[in-house]
A protein has these predicted regions:
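Noncatalytic, solvent-exposed loop/strand surfaces
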Residues: 1-228
Length: 228
């Protein structure tokens, strides 16, 4: 039951993101009183260590089933990275000091943005699929500068967080599932190395790779019937 084998319990504001654990911290994002929040908890006790508010220069259309704090944080050994569609990316150290921010958007996604950032090899990788002008961006985790950015013109609606894949031969890739296409991008340059057609319009779930096989699922219309 709820009172048995519970080490600690802490009340937090509402958010749809997942908590992320690293070292002695638990990081999460939340939305409360029109504020975009990043919160750090002590991993041993659940005590709140700090919370920081991101700027909110605009209010974007959002499906009532979504939340402005839907994307989950990402971490490396020194920093936590958060993405709010109504501002962009921000980086904090583990003590809550803001290191940089990278404004992005505005966005036009029917349900609101949902993909979380991914950190690999010093880069913060973020898929921003929307009705028009979709893109994939890599930002230097140390200074917030754009390492590369590539357009995704075929992507119209997706909320799936990408994954990193290391093939037996070749460089690490970012596997991105989006409207109608599954694609592999070189993390070093952003070049799209391969793609497979046949996906449906709404791709929502994180892909899984096992023994060299990618498993993906989605929801919506067939390839030639987008939006219906």
């Amino acid at each position: 039951g709820p009172e048995h084998n519970v080490i600690w319990k802490t009340s937090v504001p509402e958010g749809y993101s997942s908590p992320v654990l690293t070292q002695d911290r638990v990081f999460l994002t939340a939305f409360e009183d029109d504020r975009l929040l990043t919160i750090a908890l002590d991993r041993s006790t659940g005590r709140e260590l700090w919370r920081r508010e991101a700027p909110r220069p605009r209010v974007e259309r959002l499906d009532p089933r979504n939340n402005p704090a839907a994307p989950s944080p990402a971490v490396d050994d020194e920093r936590v990275y958060v993405f709010f569609a109504e501002f962009g990316l921000l980086a904090y150290d583990f003590d809550g000091n803001k290191l940089w921010d990278a404004p992005l958007g505005p966005f036009d996604n029917l349900y609101g943005m949902g993909a979380s950032p991914v950190v690999f090899d010093g880069k913060v990788l973020l898929v921003c699929d929307q009705r028009t002008d979709s893109f994939l961006i890599a930002i230097n985790g140390t200074n917030g500068q754009v390492a590369w950015r590539v357009d995704r013109p075929e992507a119209a609606s997706s909320h799936a967080t990408p994954i990193v894949w290391q093939p037996n031969n070749g460089e690490p890739q970012l596997i991105v599932v989006g409207s109608f296409l599954l694609s592999g991008y070189a993390i070093s340059t952003g070049q799209r190395l391969w793609w497979v057609r046949g996906m449906i319009h709404e791709m929502k779930s994180v892909p899984v790779i096992s023994n060299g096989i990618a498993y993906v699922n989605g929801y919506g219309s067939p390839l030639n019937d987008p939006g219906n």
